[in-house]
Amino acid sequence: MYNFNEAEYRTNLTRQIDTFGQGVELAKEITKDGYSNIFFIAVGGTVAMMMHFEEIAKQLTTIPVYAEQAGEIVLTGHRHLNRDSLIIMGSKSGDTKETVAAAKWIKDNYGCRIASMVISKESPLGRLTDYQLPLVVFKGVEYEYLSVFGLFYGLLHLHNDFPQINAFEEQLKKLPDLLVAAQAKFDAPAAKIAARYYQSPYLMWIGGGELWGEIYLFTMCILEEMQWMKTKSIKSSEFFHGTLELVDENTDVFLVKSVGAARALDDRVERFLNQYGKNVVIIDIKDYMGDIDDAFAPILAPVFSTAVLNGRLSKYFEKNTGHDLNMRRYYRQFDY
């Protein structure tokens, strides 16, 4: 596969999966001390990844779970935020300006406990963090999901909302094989898609349910930030209330189909696109998940989505555009 080190990928995934128990132990400590609700707070791709946990929480637990933009919450506050809230944050570098500012604001105003996905405990965010979530590598959104899984599903398990935690951990052990297989299966399609659409003046990306954060992340962080491509991300549930009017024979449209409860909305969009669109790409994440148990498929779907989209498609866009994924015009280049 193009630009893919399989041995390194397998090693890092295994190391990250092996930290699941550390997250569960943190969940035990936090549950023993008690908490009133959970706030996921970050910016950019990290808060996009966190949207998945908020969505799954609606379906599995009565624990109030919120995903908030760090730059907003310090200005608006939140009436459910209190001294007993558990804050889950993320900044791999540990110095994301808005996230660090939000952590300081939370500590100064509420004194909440903060669990952070951060590489260094000595970073600005790390120093404000009570519980450091294990993260073994800097790059790769799949590792971010895996970093949070132990803590989040440990908390739900201890709240009697996720009794199948041991079976879930066994499913995680399949991921090195299954994620490599998923990328191998999508490699040729990704090359073909990128060659066809890398010069598109406008790309519409549609998805929803447990994958909405993934659609938002891929369009904003990968295509816009890293490739300078003009995109629009739209929820399947909202597509028929505005965006459908932009579809014609010249519109380049991508639909990423989820595997959970919202899949019926994706099916409806697919039927419309097949009738009225000409340049349509359907990526069904279910096709790439192998023998993952149906009970855990919605939880793990974003991990597979990031493997095929970020892991394969972004690499081929980079190859065709000649625009290095690490090249930025503005982001972190100067103060703004």
Tell what function each PLM region has:
Residues 213-281:
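Internal helical hairpin/lid segments
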Residues 27-31, 75-82, 243-248:
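Short amphipathic alpha-helix with an adjacent loop that forms part of the alpha/beta core around
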Residues 36-171, 256-283:
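Glycine-rich phosphate-binding loops that contact phosphosugars or nucleotide phosphates
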Residues 2-7, 269-336:
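Phosphate-moiety recognition in structured ligand-binding domains
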Residues 120-133, 243-246, 289-299:
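Glycine-rich, charge-decorated loop segments at or immediately adjacent to ligand/cofactor-binding or catalytic sites
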Residues 2-37, 139-140, 147, 154-234, ...:
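Active-site phosphate/pyrophosphate-binding segments
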